[in-house]
Amino acid sequence: MNAARTGYRVFSANSTAACTELAKRITERLGAELGKSVVYQETNGETRVEIQESVRGQDIFIIQTIPRDVNTAVMELLIMAYALKTACARNIIGVIPYFPYSKQSKMRKRGSIVCKLLASMLAKAGLTHIITMDLHQKEIQGFFSFPVDNLRASPFLLQYIQEEIPNYRNAVIVAKSPDAAKRAQSYAERLRLGLAVIHGEAQCAEMDMDDGRHSPPMVKNATVHPGLELPLMMAKEKPPITVVGDVGGRIAIIVDDIIDDVESFVAAAEILKERGAYRIYVMATHGILSAEAPRLIEESSIDEVVVTNTVPHEVQKLQCPKIKTVDISLILSEAIRRIHNGESMAYLFRNITVDD
C-alpha cells in the first residue's frame, strides 16, 4: 500500500498489547508512525491522557479496541478525543472495530437505548467520523450526527473458509437462531452451499424478551366502553428444538456477528452433532470471550472457533488452541487512507448487500 500524504496521525487510545498491536499493524501498512501519547490510570481510578506531539490542523485517527473492561475503554476514547479537539485537530476519526453497547440499541423493559447515548457522547467529545465493523444492528448508524462507515468482515471470513477448511464444499452454513438466518443465508449464497437454521429452545433470547412494562396500573373505577376493549398479545411458546435443513454427514459452519454467550454456541454444536454433522466450525466477527470461554470451547463438540482481531482475545487464544484469528487490519488501513485522501469508500463495499 502506498503511504498516505502528510497531515494525519494515528493514535492508540489505550496501552493494552492488543490495541497497540492492531495500531502498529495499521500504521505499518500505511507507512506511518504511531502517534506519541500516554494513556494511564491515576491512583484514584481516573483516566489521564497526554498527547505528546502537535496535532494542529491534522486528521487524527484514534484506534480503540474494546477489552472486557468496556467502560474504561469508552472513557479513554472520550478523553483522548476531547484532548485532540482542544489541541485543534482538524478532524478526529474514531476507528472502533467493535462498537460497545451495540446490543443495547433497542428499548428493553424500563431501560434505555444506551447506544444512542454513547453516540451523543462521542460527538460531544469531538469525534467527526467513525470507522467500525459489523454493527450488531445496522440501524445504529442513524444514532450519529456524523458519518459512520460500517465495514464488513465477511470477505475475510469467507476467504478463510475457502482456504483453511478442508473439503468445505461438503459444508452447510448454520444459523444458531432465526435472527441470524439472513447472515447465514448470505454466506451460503456466496459459497454456493446449503443452509440450516436451529429453531426452538436454543434460539436467541433477545427475540423473546418481553417489553416488561405494565404501567400505568389499571384504573379500577373507570368506565370502559365495550367497543374499546383491546385485544391482548398472545404469550410466546417456544417449539421443541428443530434443525431446519440437512446437516447429516456434513461440515457445519455456524456464523454470527458476535460470540459473547459461548454456552449457546456449545449447545448448538451438540445439537448439530446429534443430527449427524461430523465437524463443526464457529465463525464470527467479534470474539468477546469470557474467562470461562476457552474451557467451554475446549470441552465442547466445536472443532474450531474463528474470529477477527476486532476485540482483544490473546489470553483466551493461548488457553485454547481451537481459537483462530483472522487479521482485518488491511481493510481498516485502507479505510483510513481513503478517508484522509478524500477518496470514495465504494471500493470497500463492493458486492456488499444489506444482509451482509
Swiss-Prot record:
One of its GO terms (molecular function) is enzyme regulator activity. The modification Phosphoserine is found at residues 177, 215. InterPro entries: Pribosyltran_N, PRTase-like, Rib-P_diPkinase. GO terms for cellular component: cytoplasm. Keywords: Acetylation, Nucleotide biosynthesis, Phosphoprotein. Gene3D superfamilies: 3.40.50.2020. One of its GO terms (biological process) is purine nucleotide biosynthetic process. The modification N-acetylmethionine is found at residue 1. Pfam families: Pribosyl_synth, Pribosyltran_N. Belongs to the ribose-phosphate pyrophosphokinase family. Binds to PRPS1 and PRPS2. PANTHER family: PHOSPHORIBOSYL PYROPHOSPHATE SYNTHASE-ASSOCIATED PROTEIN 1, RIBOSE-PHOSPHATE DIPHOSPHOKINASE FAMILY MEMBER. Seems to play a negative regulatory role in 5-phosphoribose 1-diphosphate synthesis. This is Phosphoribosyl pyrophosphate synthase-associated protein 1. It comes from Bos taurus.
